[in-house]
């Protein structure tokens, strides 16, 4: 293929190829040429032009296929447009000659068609350059058209379209001729030709003769397919729209005599088409007289689409202006003045569907939310008008006149359409519609409620559905509406209309409850149940109302079931009783019944029993949890009787006639539906009877063939439906298109066919339910049930039934036979499907034969859907039999049929059967079998005489490729060649063949998979072919083929991304982003979603580049140039209604945001801001809110919330609330993304600095004003969902930016300036009408804002605090005083949210207060703090303190509730019957979730409060409370006023203590996987707070089992949670437990001493663990549990401590390591705990644990003793030394009973430390000598002398000191001197003297050495100074007779460092410091040891002179004065010295 990449065709390479390859080669060359020509210079093109033209024209004769001729024409046109146009006329003449040719052979046809295409392309590109040649050309083409076949007509139409496009107005002379040709083509038998003609006419058609154009279009709709309806409706709609808006007489259009047509005329024209179709007036009138309808459904559907195109073309603004006229016209289509449109119910339902579609698509799709609100008002007006008309008629006294009035009957359809659209509109508007319902002038609810009494059942149902929509959109109206309807129903029980109407309304409203998370009050269920019972009981009292009351009663019960188990469980007994009573008790009673009664009573009876069946079905569907064994047993008894009645129905029907026909069908349907849901075992005894009835239903058809077709789609495989009618495919017009599936005389689904469906959720999203007529529904249920029942009866019975079914097919004829066959096949299919699914078996051989005969017959049925279902059953049959030979036999049957049969039906059926076999049974093992299959399908795929056969064969081939897997590899190349050959040759008019080819190509790409990345020649060729195939499909005019192309490219991109041209793929995706075809849009989004996961930035760039290149193909809807691909997707999301597509758009945007939000921050924030601001009507809100602020804050508010002044055209016009919610969620995601990026996003100073450095830098903090503004706009919107999102955004902003400082105002944070805005955003959420979920969210934001510390000024803080206070006042009355609009659990949610918010504020206040109590350095600091507001911590606590008394009681009540709710189910019977303080017993399940979300912080706050009281406030009433309402008392916190038994304070404390401890332990014990970190941390902090106080500690200390249990729980937490913060918090609790145990032991010892009077005794009594044996029992020992826990922590951080891991019993020498900060903190905390343990033990016990503790402590020291710069100790070393000191100082080391053992163990420990450190061994070089030396020092100083003074240890210690003194490292030397300093000072001479004897001389030598060479740096200076300090200490501790000698050594060294006056000036800083140090020391030593001093100075004149000079030189700078008095005490000879010192 590379050889095809040249400017001229490489003929040499071309001629060497075979026929198929030649076509491929040419196509590849032409593809390349198109790109090359556009990139080549004009001169280069002209050089080669002549040859190139010849090559291109010669290709015309080579029979090019459709894609090739299109490319050829395109290249020819490009070539002439770039090069010279001299020879263009020759080219045109040549083409015309080819067209004129008389050769009509099929082989010459491609040449003629290529010539036609070339002409079109040339004229399109060159236009007027070609002069007047077009008249001849057009004439020639039109002449050719007369004899052309369909393909020719198709290409001619497209070519004429191009010619007219290129010539523009110049082509006017030809318009008439072209119009004539197009007119005939619009009604062509080929659908493709009709489409082409419509596209052609759209170019030049104007409103010259609108009537004839319209009539022509109406004719074109007759017998049309989906594509024709789309094209022709587009033509008609656009022409009519142009006619309405053509108002510029100066334009070129006016020269074509355009007349402006009024809107009324246009609408009348469309209305005529809708009502009369394409027939003329006379024919239509004749039809009316005959009472027949001449308008076929396809015409009506076509006109419906034209209406939509017409309005869409004119746009939303036009519709808004002309809404009233348009709406009344559309409604009139279903009006009484056009009875023909609605003369039968079937017609009426279809007509209503069309009207609803027009309204939904225009009002719902084009209008923004404001315009929709106005539309709602108009619709209400229309409803009122229609209501008045009805009232006028109904007021007529004559009942007959009333009921017979055509007005009432016909206006019903207008009302139904109006009500349904009203419901849809409000449903979509959501809570945005709230102002409308509050507007009394509109009277919206009244208008709907008024028509609930309409005589027509359809209207009553539509009104009920409309109420359902209002309730879903506005949950706050659900309960009031329910109350109103129940009240009316109770009050109007004697009106049949009221009973049915209001029962429908109540049922619809109950159906809405599942869509409203806040629910309805639980008590409503009881009211409804009572009313339903009352209706059922009173039904018999009044025969006029019997049927209505019966239906209403059961309808209410059925709807009640949708409320779920929580509600139904309370009424189940009554329901089961009614269920039992509705059926006779025995068959005998049933017989008696039959003989009594009349037609009417049976009608009522059947209605009642059908209703009861429906109620039980609803129960089984919605309350599965209640279906226990016991309930099932109570359900079953009436079933046999219900089945008995089923078998008797036919005889009852004969007896009482046709009035019972519908009730009996409904009864059957209800029973079948119930049985499908129940397990077959429950009706085992009736299986045979049921089966017989099913067989009778299925074989006694009274419906048409077309109607039965609806059964088949669910039985076909989803993929197979693609090869069938487009009606089965999802399109934007499916709502109206699906009518055509059933044929003209068949009813579509509609609500009035089954009122019981009003409370069920519609399968297709949220539109009104559309149940089919009972006659169809019963067949559907029967066929499903047949599958189940047939699988459970005995084999004999099964055989008999199948035989009976087969016979019934044989014995019927004609259309009737088709219906029976259809029913039977669908039933057998569901049977096979059921058996295959349940892994059952088919039965005897005979069964196989019957099944085979049945399916075989259907495989050859003329109905394609039936063939499809049969192919599926064929494969299922093989799957069920599961026998290789049988499967092979089936395949062989199909082979034989395909070889012999020539008819399309057999060939399509059996080819699909082969594919289905492979799908269910894989590759059917044998490759020979696979070869045969592929061979046959190849042959069929090339049968160009039948596109159907090709389509089915190729589809089957795609299934085989998919299922064969690797087995297919050998066939890949030939299959790919076949696909490419067919793609290049099959005419584009056969789109279905191309679609199947696309599926094959897709399957092949999947089969090749990642191998497509390979570089071998064969793979490269395959890849090129795949790409070429995709290119052909991308150019196909059919949208589904284009979708397949995109899907194939998506697969290719997944497996071989480098080889797919991303730029062209993205370009293709952008062009089709707003395609009118749903499936194409879905394919585009699915592909985009995949691309952006890998290459979001590249995709986005390509899209923008494409938009900048301003290609004309880009749809104006996708405004990529202005808003980028991201913005285009947001716009699309706003307009899109398909749920799957919306999901994909959101996913795509999320992926793009994740990878690009940080880089394109401004773009993303602008998009979100534009979406949120586009329809934010927040000017008013701002005014209202700021009015409530103080004057000074207005400026702040305005700074962020100014309204947009620039009302420029906005990329987002009126986005819907759902889009705005998504934008708000995006903002939160953007903030999260920035959090993981650069820290500058949350540091304004750094951000500004980096922005200055490079202006392209962008940081989130710079957009804070926008973030606040967006959050404000969202939080104050009308839409509740948006308010929730806005509050969440505000919460995220507060949490992320609370600590960002404001650089311009030190001590302040950046958020402080927005406090007015935050207040204004929060305030609306606390109004009385706000829903609880919004208030709950706002409470969370309030507490976050107060806790964030942003606001320091208490007055500012009070505003938000006041909101929480108001909430607290509201909730004080507990569950009694809260809203009755929602379920009680909603009140629980709100109460707990308020309490949680207060808890958070209190926790923060206490923490700040604690931090603030840390002593402040100076008073000035304190004053500054107050001035800066940082000292508001006490103030905040004061704010909370005012309400703390109330809060504490409420918190305790909430915790008690939570404790009750978390009890295991076995305690359910003991729970209080009325519920808890804040929940009711009935709603406890729903309430649990809210408690789970809130309990942790409430627990922490309660614990803090109890801590603050020290457990000494017995009654919370004593706490300050400023609230007057009484708090709900609970047993937990009853005051003396409660009237209950008064508890002692001790009991109250104990209860509270156990409540908090119990909740904590229960939670920590069984941590759920979804337990949040916040909850665990809060729980641990609560325990910490609890144990901060003596009283709870004493409880824990005295109850050892409790302590152990708690430790075990904490151990588990540490094991299961890796978070360091949680583990640290757990360790802190452990430490407190040990403290509690210590205190307990101390207390026992103290009291024992006091009791025994033994205070003077030396021995301590035996208290503590270990008693007098020292044994610690695992599970019973607190110490053991603590050790386990600490070992766990230590070994996790330092695995080397585990002897099992290291394989060594002792502390093994390994390289030390530094732990991370978290690890260090954990290890340190564990060591602190270990060091406390001996104090909890008895002396014997301490001996047991000491080895372990020492091993671990020394182990940590050894493992982490790393050398750090500057001689620092690592935190773990410091902790281990501290712990060591604690252990060594333990009283147990000195206790009489343990002293000896401790001494031995401590000596061993010291030996271990000494052994760790051996300078000879190389591996120890890493160890820090200072750490080990410090450890030795701790031993020396902290233990009793007998530990360290034994000679061997003492000698080793001294050696270590000597060794370190020799180390050159100055840091080590300094530390050694410091340690020796402390040892030398040790008061016990036995310890210190050996060290002094051994080391003093050594130190002296060192100092003299320094003295000789003088220090050169600070380190040496420090060493010297420390050395001197050690010598000074020696002097101090030395005995008197040695002291003079030591001073004599010390003084010369000090004096030698003194400088005289001259030297001091020039000395280095080190020498100067040394001088100062020496002088200072001399000044101190002189007076202390004056005699030695004097004698030394006297004996050495040099020293004396030096000292005098130094003092003299220093007299200015040194301020240290030696007191004269000391020297004057002993005057002597040394007067000069005295003089000097005196002088000083």
UniProtKB/Swiss-Prot annotation:
Keywords: Phosphoprotein, Repeat. Transmembrane segments: none annotated. GO terms for cellular component: cytosol; endocytic vesicle. Belongs to the HEATR5 family. Signal peptide: none annotated. The modification Phosphothreonine is found at residue 1115. This is HEAT repeat-containing protein 5A. It comes from Homo sapiens. It comes from the Eukaryota. The modification Phosphoserine is found at residues 1110, 1647. GO terms for biological process: endocytosis; protein localization; retrograde transport, endosome to Golgi. The keyword Repeat applies. Residues 1646-1668 are annotated as: Disordered. HEAT repeats lie at residues 846-883, 1079-1116.
